[in-house]
């Protein structure tokens, strides 16, 4: 039997992600999204209910997440709750991915939102757990609780992949 996988993509949609850097003619967001779309379309093509995807947007104009009433979780929006990805949800997601008009929003807090999505969905069952953060690193980050967050990720066996361009 194939392993169950839960992957949450955190997409930095801050205004700076609309810039073109490193000599590219495409925006930083479009460059990073090539990797994300490749991974998500592979998951959709596999058509397995045990390959689950969630999408969290960072540095968004609005706020929509379970922790939004707590300080520090503003400008973070869950675009898709963790679960199987379908073609229709993929199309809907594609329409919502564009740079925002803000630079506010904390990547560390977005990771906390992603960890919460994964823990809530997978419970203590056997899953491969992964968070993929796509960012240009231009947003402010509050690293006060990073040791506790790192410990929580290790305890939950969550792998973190960071795709960035610091140009």
What are these model-predicted stretches?
Residues 1-167:
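Intrinsically disordered, low-complexity, Ser/Thr/Glu/Asp/Lys/Arg-enriched terminal regions and linkers
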